[in-house]
Amino acid sequence: MKVLGIETSCDETGVAIYDGSVRRLLGHCLHSQIDLHAAYGGVVPELASRDHIRRLPLLLKQLFGETGLSRRDIDAVAYTAGPGLAGALLTGASFAEAFALAAGVPALPIHHLEGHLLSPLLADDAPRFPFVALLVSGGHTQLMHVAGVGRYELLGESLDDAAGEAFDKTAKLLGLGYPGGPQLSALAAQGCAGRFKLPRPMLHSGDFDFSFSGLKTAVLNRVSSDDWEPGLAADLAADFQEAVVEVLCAKALAALKHTGLDTLVVAGGVGANRRLRERLDNLAARRRYRVCYPEPALCTDNGAMIAFAGALRLEAGERRAAAPAVRVRPRWPLVELDAPGCP
């Protein structure tokens, strides 16, 4: 069962083929729109949609060339149906449904966050259900209890800014370019944490929710003060990163203790953050917990995770008739996702 995956939820265009019969990713191609949006300091939805339209046929041709496969080899198409930018989602969904109709194969709308959540299972030493998942990206910060494919319970989430969003906004406050998160992390690596006393929002709230807007405001107050020196930006970046990482780690480990589980899956763009991985690994090792991540290349948005999620759903009994019905949900809570086989 070879599944073609298509990802266009924001500013990355991704295509991939996963073969469920041999449980192997056969190939994936990805195009980032960073250069396209850099001049604007953020993603411009209209430009993102147009670029997806241009790139999808080219990437698919490249993917078929690299894998030696063709349209006739594809058994199903999985595409990101939400959440994300409406126009960007529609480009991928339309392309996927048209391909599926022409090839006479089923098309499966996939939840973007489910793709991230399941991506660590692509590893050779994949975690087994059940586990706790920490989803950390530009748009979402959530802790989930994962009992199986499509069986998700929300334990806690950000009440305002997501962790990745806080990274991006703080990067702008420090005068860094786009994309802000990776640039802030790079700057933090040059600094020394401990100079600035920044808050750890909701660290002791007794639940699994997050809040990062107050931390961002603390940085704004610091850089707006009369005694601020730009030469201290690296130290401030390091302290900001430490504050976010400390809260993420504390909540994630508390969720493991609360559920009685011993495996944590970390997914989403912020999951590639080196300091987060370092601290989580150290803390988890002391408690004999296991922490699993996707490989760094699969932390950002990509088609591989969508193809894989589609393959798992088909394996679990999900069936979709090939039809030119484009289904997208720009706002789509993960807990509203049906388990495979549900009507």
From Swiss-Prot:
Pfam families: TsaD (PF00814). This is tRNA N6-adenosine threonylcarbamoyltransferase. Its EC number is 2.3.1.234. Substrate binds at L135, V136, S137, G138, G139, D168, G181, N273. The gene is tsaD. Its cofactor is Fe(2+). HAMAP family: TsaD. Gene3D superfamilies: 3.30.420.40. Required for the formation of a threonylcarbamoyl group on adenosine at position 37 (t(6)A37) in tRNAs that read codons beginning with adenine. Is involved in the transfer of the threonylcarbamoyl moiety of threonylcarbamoyl-AMP (TC-AMP) to the N6 group of A37, together with TsaE and TsaB. TsaD likely plays a direct catalytic role in this reaction. Belongs to the KAE1 / TsaD family.
